[in-house]
Amino acid sequence: TAQHDLSSLRAFGSTGEPWNPTPWWWLFETVGQRRLPIINYSGGTEIAGGILSCTTIEPQVPCAFTGPVPGMAADVVDDEGRPVRGQVGELVLRQPWVGMTAGFWRDPDRYLATYWSRWPNLWVHGDWALIDTDGFWYILGRSDDTLKIAGKRLGPAEVESIAVSHPAVQEAAAIGIPDPVKGEALVVFCQLRQGIQQSPGLIEELRDRITERLGKPLRPERIHIVRELPRTRNAKIMRRVIRAAYLGHDPGDLSALENPGAVEEIAAIGRAQGMPVTREESTG
């Protein structure tokens, strides 16, 4: 960053993937010199705008949003549709919004099933979210990417944040694969920083790091080092595609995929591992 004139920089805008603390702090401290705000913003095409955002007049909290965009009746609810604080739940809207999608072309039933079928009069956006005790909001990833391991439900971002806190890891993606005992077993794919070489010692370091933070039931079954992670053209990691490729399933619609070679690499790793995994094959 020292090679560039950043004197005109006033703030950072961020949207898309959930933040991990390590890159958030790097941007805030190294590029922003601890004085420029990071404006976190999250919404969707289907509502024609944002649901959550930040302001420049309220405290900055790593990876967080200060709250809903004005006019958005956002909330976080549990499996029964009840508001929750301090725990992960579904991001919903309690009132209509002027830009909200009114239907799918020639498929009204799928529209209702996608957004309105979980609870009466609640729009389900499809993201896991959390409101902490101080009132700050967090997006934790797509709810259809949720990991359910040994009776615990967690978002992949919780695992990925730990992986990328290791100085060797550039990016990470966590998925769950079928396990007859735990329901799902944790598998993590890591893209290393330039110049870092893969080694058995590094794999064990990462596995131990995640286990120490999350507990033994969430110890990764396997950790794979890949050249790159499948992502969309706007840089979102495609965990659904990663899981399907690894298990040898049809990945579905790939029209948004930016780097097909990444999917082929993961599919080859899955074949080499003899997916789908069983308890007897476990290496954890």
What would you call each of these model-derived segments?
Residues 263-284:
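Cysteine/selenocysteine-centered motifs that mediate thiol-based redox chemistry or coordinate metal-sulfur cofactors
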Residues 38, 74, 172-174, 220-225:
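Generic structural signal for residues in well-ordered beta-strands
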Residues 3, 65-66, 82, 163, ...:
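A general structural signal for stabilizing positions within well-ordered secondary structure
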Residues 10-136, 143-146, 159:
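Conserved AMP-binding/adenylate-forming
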Residues 11, 90, 170-171, 222:
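Residues at the N-termini of beta-strands
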